[in-house]
């Protein structure tokens, strides 16, 4: 049994952390922090959690990070806020899972360039994608939870990059639900703007681009990945469907070989499902911690199309964070996470 606290429990990722952790048999929820909601009952903000275990007795607290006194702390805070909190937590000896982008880059200058923020300083962090960094995560004190777009994109492309069978120029086209924009509404996420519409945004400048590039490059040092990434906001609440395009170096490689490569690469991964026929769907993963991968179509020019589907709030955020918790704590890594998508 471990004690956990959540810093920033009022947003969507905080809500999902609570929803999943309330069914985790090895976890005791100790503190859930919020400055604005100090003293307010958790179920006032998250009524979907009412009557689940002891949640009705918990309130949000405005409490200093150094006073959380927990084995694990989830930082569900905005980019730029975590780096002001994490150093203090790190000194207490708590293990930390940060859901912001603040510790995802080994090169802080890259973070500062793409996030337009000055970083407070480097700490030893492990990139929290279990399928690629499981052993490092188990030993880490600080884990940087991956971004939602990078999660689906990296998992879709990793076997091809690792094998060294594709050219270094890659295109990723992603469609995402509006929950990825966070709990605070904007003109872009306003219902009349997004309903029956698809909105491309940050078409060449999205800050997840270098995160995808750098992680893929670690898989094969001979690769200097040149990624073109364009996200689109779709009239969905949850989910990211990423269609990846790359070119095979050897056009003699056929679809069966590609599928064998993916099955071998992910054969021991509990949350990656390979679809040998057709493409994955968002309804198949909604509400779950799965990443479904399929497509594997090759055109006459040697272009290979691989598609991934994830729930941006679960596998793309809170579910993956809890997967990391399980690894760091030595629990069964699927604990509280092994359930199917909400289809239909």
From Swiss-Prot:
GO terms for cellular component: cytoplasm. Keywords: Amino-acid biosynthesis, Arginine biosynthesis, Cytoplasm, NADP, Oxidoreductase. InterPro entries: AGPR_AS, AGPR_type-1, NAD(P)-bd_dom_sf, NAGSA_dehydrogenase, Semialdehyde_DH_NAD-bd. The active site is at residue 148. The keyword Zinc does not apply. The keyword NADP applies. It comes from the Archaea. It is found in: Cytoplasm. Its EC number is 1.2.1.38. One of its GO terms (biological process) is L-arginine biosynthetic process. Belongs to the NAGSA dehydrogenase family. Type 1 subfamily. NCBIfam families: argC. This is N-acetyl-gamma-glutamyl-phosphate reductase. It comes from Methanococcus aeolicus (strain ATCC BAA-1280 / DSM 17508 / OCM 812 / Nankai-3). The lineage of its organism: Archaea, Methanobacteriati, Methanobacteriota, Methanomada group, Methanococci.
């Amino acid at each position: 049994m471990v004690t956990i606290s959540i810093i920033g429990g009022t947003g969507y990722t905080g809500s999902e952390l609570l929803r999943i952790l309330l069914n985790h048999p090895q976890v005791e929820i100790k503190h859930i922090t919020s400055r604005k909601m100090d003293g307010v009952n958790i179920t006032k903000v998250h009524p979907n959690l009412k009557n689940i275990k002891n949640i009705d007795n918990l309130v949000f607290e405005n409490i200093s990070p150094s006073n959380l006194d927990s084995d694990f702390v989830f930082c569900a805070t905005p980019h730029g806020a975590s780096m002001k909190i994490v150093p203090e937590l790190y000194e207490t000896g708590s293990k930390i899972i940060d859901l912001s982008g603040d510790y995802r880059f080994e090169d802080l200058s890259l973070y500062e360039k793409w996030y337009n923020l000055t970083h407070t300083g480097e700490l030893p962090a492990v990139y929290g994608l279990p399928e690629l960094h499981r052993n490092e995560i188990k030993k880490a004190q600080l884990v940087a939870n991956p971004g939602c777009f990078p999660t689906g994109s990296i998992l879709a492309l990793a076997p091809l990059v690792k094998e060294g069978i594709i050219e270094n120029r890659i295109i990723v086209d992603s469609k995402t639900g509006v929950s990825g924009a966070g709990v605070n509404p904007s003109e872009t996420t306003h219902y009349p703007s997004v309903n029956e519409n698809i909105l491309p945004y940050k078409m060449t400048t999205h800050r997840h681009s270098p995160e995808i590039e750098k992680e893929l490059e670690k898989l094969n040092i001979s690769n200097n990945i040149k990624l073109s990434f364009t996200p689109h906001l779709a009239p969905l609440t949850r989910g990211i469907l990423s269609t990846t395009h790359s070119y095979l170096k050897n056009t003699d490689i056929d679809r069966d070989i590609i599928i064998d490569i993916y099955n071998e690469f992910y054969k021991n991964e509990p949350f990656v499902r390979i679809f040998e026929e057709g493409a994955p769907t968002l309804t198949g993963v909604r509400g779950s911690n799965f990443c479904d991968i399929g497509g594997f179509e090759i055109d006459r020019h040697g272009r290979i199309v691989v598609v991934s589907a994830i729930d941006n709030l679960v596998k793309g955020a809170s579910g993956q964070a809890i997967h990391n918790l399980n690894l760091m704590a030595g629990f069964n890594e699927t604990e509280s996470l092994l359930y199917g998508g909400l289809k239909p």
